[in-house]
Every structure is written in C-alpha cells, then in structure tokens.
C-alpha cells in the first residue's frame, strides 16, 4: 500500500510491474479506476507538427533494450540437491541520458543484476554496470561503455506541465519486441503508485498508451518527443502465474521531474535520501490527509502528531488529500522543519515536525 513514512490503508487494486522475465513482484495502489480511453490512431498530430512516426524517429535512437541476468533462489534445490540459486533473465528498456553513457531505467529492471547487456537500435550490444538505484522511486541508472556514435540522449520534459488529454507515445520492449511504439493520451496526472520498497511514488502519470511486460524503463514521450516519464506499472486483473499482466489501458509512468532529480543524485555520487514523517495515512479524506496511526519513535511521534489528526496545510499550503500530502513531503529533504496545520477534535493547531530520513523499507506492520 502507498506509504509516506507509513502507509495508506484500504481500497487497493493490483498493479503489475511492467518488466519482462521471471519476476513475481506485484504492487498495489489506491488510484481510482477510470473509464478506459481509446488509443489515438497512429496518424494523430500533436498540434506541434509531430506525428507518432516523427516522435518515434526522433526519440528511438535514444531508447535501448536492456537484458539483465540475475541470481535467484532455486526452489528445486531442496528436493534434488545442487546449488540453491539459479540464473534468471529479465528484459526492459531504458533511455540514454547523457554522452557519458548513463542510461535511465526502472530500479526493478536491474535490481539484483549480475550482468547487464544493452542493445542499441543499430543492433550492436554492449555490457553495462549498475551505477545506482533508488527503490523509493523505482529509478535506476546504468552506465554503458559504448562509442559516442551510439549515444543519442533524449531531452526531458517538465512533467508538472502535463495535462489530461495531452498526446503521448511509449517506446519499449514488450514481450521481447524492441522498439515497439504505442500511442495514447495522458489519462490523469498526480497519481500515487507503490515503489519496490512499498513507499509511495507521487505524481505518477496515468496513460492509456499500451504498456506491457518489457516496457518498464522505456520512455513515455510527449508531443515534442521529450521524456515525460519512465513507464513503470500497469493495472491488471489478469496477471499470469509469474505475476505479469498485459495492458488494460491503465498504465503509469514515473514523472520525469522525479526521474531527473534522482538520476542526477546517483550520477553525482550522492546518497539518495527522502524526507520521512512516520505516519500511517488513511485513504483519501475530505479536506486533508488523515493520520491512521503514528510509528513509535518517528519524527511524527516526536512532534506530537496523533491518530485521527487531519493535516490541512504544510507551511501554509493547503493539503486537500492524502496524495497531495505525500507529494508535498516529497519536495522536502531530511533535516528540514515543516509546520503542519492539524485539525484535532474540532480544534486547529500548528505542529512543527523536523523531517527524518526514510528507512530503506516501510516499517513492519505498516
């Protein structure tokens, strides 16, 4: 369940991580299921003179296919002896970020990798290493040793400017079919999805462009062929035994502003840290973010936050929902102090909270 220093309770639907291979990961989120939008025809124009084909031709040289080999536990070893691990392969996509060979993808694509191979559009392949990952945002960075002629960085868009109805194009490797291109629209913005470590990724972009296993880490492109986000998850009610599902017209991308912020920290050799309050949040409540419980010893507990408190503002900015609270806290860094306006038993009070550093995974018991 989505968590910001805790978790959001109730009302979850299944999401499948959209990477290929034998992964059995699945996550949940509290997004409301909207009516599916019909995908735009391949001849649509963005209004800026770019068709799907033009977007593809502009961006595809900077999209790569990623093949990952990892070690996983071998359930048969206990019965038949031998090694307790086995090699597994997974597949995803990535975006060339700079001329140094840095490629951005999803953390879950490269998690646990023992080897990484990158396939470029011209068919050439090169080995890569994992430079760093952030499970809290599902962002990963790999670096490939390839000649400059292979590296075609794609410009990034400002994801905060995305609007419902904007045309988008997804490129990736669904079902081991590299350079597959699909089109659609931005179905909604500001969604919350669940990261590999069970925290919440705020401001995700929802799209009806077809996203399937193998699309993870590939770009969601705007009408200017700029990266609006990295394709990450799909809603599915028909997951296979491996935990994978197919497109249902409801997909989610990590917003480009989040991707760039995390990637720049990783490439710069910094440790990625996230602000932490330590509260379990109820589902979206009218007029604010309601606290279901407070983790003992956390910044929220030390500041005096209590269960049933309704947070209505942070530093004077109105908070109208749980999702907005999560997104707002994500803009801060550990060590900063914020003033939370809280409604408690009919009384309004301001409580100062010194934000901590988010633990590696959500506390046990939520």
Predicted regions located by residue number:
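Conserved catalytic motifs of ABC-family nucleotide-binding domains
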Residues: 308
């Amino acid at each position: 369940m989505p968590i910001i220093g805790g978790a959001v309770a109730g009302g979850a639907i299944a999401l499948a991580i959209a990477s290929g291979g034998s992964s059995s990961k699945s996550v949940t989120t509290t997004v409301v299921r909207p009516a599916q939008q019909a995908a735009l025809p391949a001849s649509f124009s963005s209004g800026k003179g770019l068709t799907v084909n033009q977007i593809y031709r502009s961006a595809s040289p900077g999209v790569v296919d990623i093949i990952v080999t990892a070690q996983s536990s071998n359930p048969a070893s206990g019965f038949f002896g031998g090694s307790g691990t086995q090699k597994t392969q997974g597949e995803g996509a990535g975006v060339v970020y700079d001329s140094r060979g840095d490629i951005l993808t999803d953390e879950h694509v490269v998690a646990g990798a023992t080897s990484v191979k990158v396939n470029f559009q011209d068919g050439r392949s090169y080995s890569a290493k994992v430079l760093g990952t952030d499970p809290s945002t599902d962002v990963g960075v790999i670096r490939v040793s390839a000649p400059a002629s292979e590296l075609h960085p794609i410009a990034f868009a400002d994801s905060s400017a995305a609007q419902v109805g904007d045309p988008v194009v997804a490129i990736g490797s669904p079902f081991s079919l590299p350079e597959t291109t699909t089109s659609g629209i931005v179905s909604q913005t500001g969604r919350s999805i669940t990261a590999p470590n069970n925290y919440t990724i705020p401001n995700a972009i929802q799209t009806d462009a077809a996203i399937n296993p193998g699309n993870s880490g590939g770009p969601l492109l705007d009408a200017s062929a700029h990266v609006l986000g990295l394709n990450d998850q799909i809603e599915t009610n028909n997951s296979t035994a491996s935990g994978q599902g197919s497109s249902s017209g409801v997909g989610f991308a990590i917003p480009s502003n989040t991707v760039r912020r995390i990637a720049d920290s990783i490439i710069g050799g910094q440790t990625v840290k996230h602000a932490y309050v330590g509260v379990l949040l109820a589902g979206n409540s009218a007029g604010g973010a309601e606290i279901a419980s407070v983790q003992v010893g956390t910044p929220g507990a030390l500041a005096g936050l209590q269960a049933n408190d309704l947070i209505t503002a942070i530093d004077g900015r109105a908070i109208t929902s749980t999702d907005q609270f999560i997104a707002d806290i994500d803009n801060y860094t550990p060590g900063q102090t914020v003033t939370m306006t809280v409604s408690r038993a009919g009384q309004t009070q301001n409580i100062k909270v010194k934000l901590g550093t988010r633990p590696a995974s959500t506390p046990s018991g939520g």
